[in-house]
């Protein structure tokens, strides 16, 4: 969905010219350790059922027989997409494992317990949900091998007089 009506004014000597700035895409970008994109993609496919929609490879290899390393990969998960990228391709950036990065994703599910179990089977570490998080509707939490925290929430069904079956 594009963002509209963001206006910028430019002059070229003849007077102001109005242009509209439109954003066509917004994606999360998750940085992982050098040459770990393939491992991350495998984990996210296994743990969460992510679907890879595209990737780019390192342009150079040491040997022709060597498998190329994945530089970045776009994954689709629960109607959203995010890019997993090799941190070595972006000087000055750090990975989610870096201290204080605080990268967290929230996934809505009908069965948080099963989601936690599947993520742990794929290599994540279970993290206890705090009392405050439970009050927010969070039912499970894991940290993946790449330092990202994943919170699982179960959607609550609120029954009111308006939507109550008779």
Swiss-Prot record:
Keyword hit for Ribosomal protein: no
Protein's name in the database: Uncharacterized protein At5g48480
UniProt entry tagged with the keyword Cell wall biogenesis/degradation: no
Lineage: Eukaryota, Viridiplantae, Streptophyta, Embryophyta, Tracheophyta
Signal peptide positions on this chain: none
Modified residues (N-acetylalanine): 2
Gene Ontology CC terms: cytosol
Native source organism of the sequence: Arabidopsis thaliana
Keyword entries, A-Z: Acetylation
Subunit record text: Homodimer.
InterPro entries: At5g48480-like_C (IPR054575), At5g48480-like_N (IPR054576), Glyas_Bleomycin-R_OHBP_Dase (IPR029068)
